[in-house]
């Protein structure tokens, strides 16, 4: 039970004493009203889809094709471009009509969802159990809850397969690693080798290992979606046709608030993973649309100055910097030739504009002298001046502030927002998990307002 300072407060004809919930717990009204809760869910989905459609059209109306996508404060169009819509070689946007269509479709969908939300909130039955038993439920009905879990898993699995179908059969997806600087490509041979796909999960998250954030080719990304989509669909079928085993019945708390806590915990974890993925990965999040990663901007600057000074006659292989280490090139701890200077800390960076210049032992001196292409120079110069950093001084060798006035990288935005949201979801998970466990144990921890020590203390004034 939540505890108010004023236990007699009545809001909307409901008080804390008779309902067990304080006035701010608005959703508590719907705990046992499955029809009204359905209305709230559908209306919430409508609001989400409306935002997506409206923001999509807002970004389309402000989009300037001549400027890089990451320079325009866009967070939705890069996702659509990554799916291969309206994109040409090198990540150039050649058609914005698919983006307009996406926005309109989302707006139309939001209207349908909004109507459904209003209907079920105001007109439809308060509870579904009597009229529509298939859609009705009781929170403690363990079998029904796992059925609902199953339906959710199947929908998630189909969502994963949608990406697979788009990549393999419906025009392909944008691949930043395509020769010549990236292009839309049909993925004809996705990775289905379980050792490769699940190998990412057992990799270290540190350094160049990078856990799942280290995925660096579209074949593995699409193959991973084949695996996850198939497993989720099979898991969904399993949960629909089976009942929870005895150990699961004992281990879990079976209440609405417990399910809320499980969901918040899962979303929190996904938020943290999305934070790392959008910050570090330049394959699932191509730099042509999202801007360079931090290490990528730093390596770009080292590359740009190497190109400039090499043209001016510098011997980039032997020139020393102020510390006595190589000014342009040096060796990594394991012997590879890497860029020198502050960017040495990012020596394990991999990017499609740099990899053609590598040999069997790191950067290839002969290629650096003879094989650098104009598109690599242009891209490095662009990335150098668009670091996803907000420092007043240099970070990783990149002079951030001078070159980044009024520039916020989509990577900065996505990483920071997902970290903050993931953190808040995680705190919500802890809060609701604690309440659910306490309720299941027969007590809810709170401050006893009648015996609170402060009530007997002398007033401050």
Curated annotation (Swiss-Prot):
GO biological process: photosynthetic electron transport in photosystem II
Spans through the membrane: 57-81, 122-143, 166-188, 243-263, 279-300, 435-459
Domain of life: Eukaryota
SUPFAM superfamilies linked to this entry: Photosystem II antenna protein-like
Post-translational modification note: Phosphorylated in vitro.
The keyword rRNA processing belongs to this UniProt entry's keyword annotation: no
Alphabetized InterPro entries for the sequence: PS_antenna-like (IPR000932), PS_II_antenna-like_sf (IPR036001), PSII_PsbC (IPR005869), PSII_PsbC_sf (IPR044900)
Pfam families assigned to the protein according to its UniProt record, in alphabetical order: PSII
Presence of keyword Nucleus: no
Binding site for [CaMn4O5] cluster: 355
Cell location: Plastid, Chloroplast thylakoid membrane
Modified residues (Phosphothreonine): 3
Manner of cofactor binding, per the entry note: Binds multiple chlorophylls and provides some of the ligands for the Ca-4Mn-5O cluster of the oxygen-evolving complex. It may also provide a ligand for a Cl- that is required for oxygen evolution. PSII binds additional chlorophylls, carotenoids and specific lipids.
Membrane topology: Multi-pass membrane protein
Keywords: Acetylation, Chlorophyll, Chloroplast, Chromophore, Manganese, Membrane, Metal-binding, Phosphoprotein, Photosynthesis, Photosystem II, Plastid, Thylakoid, Transmembrane, Transmembrane helix
Modified residues (N-acetylthreonine): 3
Entry's Gene Ontology cellular component terms: chloroplast thylakoid membrane; photosystem II
GO molecular function annotation: chlorophyll binding; electron transporter, transferring electrons within the cyclic electron transport pathway of photosynthesis activity; metal ion binding
Role played: One of the components of the core complex of photosystem II (PSII). It binds chlorophyll and helps catalyze the primary light-induced photochemical processes of PSII. PSII is a light-driven water:plastoquinone oxidoreductase, using light energy to abstract electrons from H(2)O, generating O(2) and a proton gradient subsequently used for ATP formation.
HAMAP family, A to Z: PSII_PsbC_CP43
Family: Belongs to the PsbB/PsbC family. PsbC subfamily.
Name of the molecule in the record: Photosystem II CP43 reaction center protein
High-level lineage: Eukaryota, Viridiplantae, Chlorophyta, core chlorophytes, Chlorophyceae
Gene: psbC
